Amino acid sequence: MPRLSRRQLLKTAAISTALSTVPAPLLAASREKLVVPPLIEVRRGRPIVLTMQETNYPLDGSHNVTVWGFNGNYLGPTIKIKSGSFAKLNYHNNLPQSVALSIQGLQASGELFGGAARVLKKGESWAPIVPIEQPAASCWYRSATLANSAYQTYRGLAGMWLIEDEQSLKANLPNKYGVDDIPLILQDMEFNNDGLQLFKQNQPHFVGNRLLVNGIEAPYLDVARGWIRLRLLNASLARAYDLRLDNDQEMLLIAQDLGFLPKAKSVKSLVLSPGERAEILVNMMKLTTYLSLAEVNVACTKNKKYVVLRR
């Protein structure tokens, strides 16, 4: 496949497709539907309210347990903001621990977007105003608390932060959030018999044995006919993922951590290290049943399929 310039990418793309034979109704019956994080689209100075708090959620699929997150949900909402505007943040910490937050990939000074030096104790709030002055990119926010960031991120203090610019807004790319423009937050975890998250504080490279997408293990998602855009985030602590489509179909890699690639790349697999982001396009036009985003080499995991895309 010829390499595409960014200008060509914003106009058109082409990927070969393949078919799978498992009936979609049977497949979906054994899986939960993907939860798409709520969207906060910032317009005309709308404040971004992020309240860190405990909530109840069945992470293991059966036990309703206490987890952490934002605004009453496990994980945080997706923030979408245009370059050239200001992010009016309102952080509130209702958790039993002190928390510092950071926005990874955001090009702004640390005193404005947080970091380990800006700690919020239980009950405290903070309302910085952050100028957004960079090209379109998929960033993410997470805990940056000194000596405790891994644990707090693992508990659920993470979410996606999407920056758009004039070019990305005019692009001929999927942009209907939750329909054909879908965030996928990848995590690995361990649970006890009661469904509570296990975290091995003294293990330098913690790797769980359960794989979750947006807080659900191996979910399915009904998607639109045609092209879909997947915004991938590896929110795991130590696990790197080698991702592919299980029918060996090609994906079009269009963006990574700091924005669009100079030229799009047709790939059959994609490696994501912890904290890395990537955007891929998948052609669902000819697909009659489903395909799965899976990991090529998964060790010590219960289920290698991350999310089933069903049309």
UniProtKB/Swiss-Prot annotation:
Organism: Haemophilus influenzae (strain ATCC 51907 / DSM 11121 / KW20 / Rd)
Plastocyanin-like domain sequence ranges: 228-297
Top-level lineage group: Bacteria
Entry's localization field: Periplasm
Signal peptide boundaries: 1-29
UniProt GO cellular component terms: periplasmic space
Homology family: Belongs to the FtsP family.
Function according to Swiss-Prot or TrEMBL: Cell division protein that is required for growth during stress conditions. May be involved in protecting or stabilizing the divisomal assembly under conditions of stress.
Key words, A-Z: Cell cycle, Cell division, Periplasm, Signal
Gene: ftsP
Gene3D superfamilies found in the cross-reference section: Cupredoxins - blue copper proteins
UniProt protein name: Putative cell division protein FtsP
GO molecular function annotation: copper ion binding
Main location per the UniProt record: periplasm
One BP term from GO: cell division
Keyword Nucleus tagged: no
